[in-house]
Amino acid sequence: MSWSAKQYVAFEEERTRPVRDLLGALPPIDARSVIDIGCGPGNSTEELAARYPRARAIGIDSSQDMIEAARARLPNIHFKVQDLNTWNDPGPFDVILANAVLQWVPNHEVLLPAFAAKLSPRGALAVQMPDNLGEPAHRMMREVAAAGPWASKLEHASKARTPLPKPEWYYAQLKPVCSKIDIWRTTYFHSLPGGPGAVVEWFKGSGLRPFLEPLSGEERSAYLERYTAEIAKVCLPLADGGVLLPFPRVFLAAIR
């Protein structure tokens, strides 16, 4: 699946706020080695480096486009294209940040203990994942996909992500390898100017990618037209013409 840094950063402030909230929950350790997994265009890496200014920061992402944007943004930080499934750097890292990436990756029962094993003693694992598959905006992606002439092409798109396990499950995975675990869930109400169309633009940078990529240009336009019409039914304009986008997110902050 390809990614567009330009599309993603169209709502950079809203996408970056959860990173700040997550990093703010970590202890003020004297970190010397930190890594941003799934760093995207570098907005989260910038926050990580600011939180731990004495540390050597690294950013990895599977998207060449994202890495190029991150390098342009932060030329003094080392970024590389790296598939998370084949990432084998043993560390140790004082902080591992995984912001809005693990929702795309299966086998959390394997990944999370493996990440914790890469931490230095008292190192921190910081994870943030969208938990919004049940929200109308995501439900409509699947409904429009199933109801259109593109249904066979998009059969697998609805399976690109699966619902997140419950907090108790994550606690059970981390408890054997971590001394302290904080888990919380927050719903942000992002204020987006531009009406329902802004919601569509938001998800074109994230959740819609698996649905749009398999389609031809003509099919893509038709899909987006139908999806926008459905979004307009539930994301009603506010008095100023904007909309509020409810966006639930799950946070994990664990200390080895």
PLM regions: where:
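A short acidic, Gly/Pro-enriched loop at the edge of an enzyme's catalytic core
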Residues: N88-I96
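Class I SAM-dependent methyltransferase SAM/SAH-binding core
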Residues: S33-D89, V110
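Conserved alpha-helix/loop element of class I SAM-dependent methyltransferases that forms part
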Residues: E14-R32, E47
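A short SAM/SAH-binding and catalytic strip from SAM-dependent methyltransferases
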Residues: V95-E109, D131
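Class I SAM-dependent methyltransferase Rossmann-like catalytic core
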Residues: M1-E13
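Conserved catalytic/acceptor-binding region of the Class I
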Residues: E109, A116, R122-G194
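Conserved Class I S-adenosyl-L-methionine
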Residues: P41-N43, R161-R256
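Short conserved AdoMet
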Residues: P27, P53, R71, P75, ...
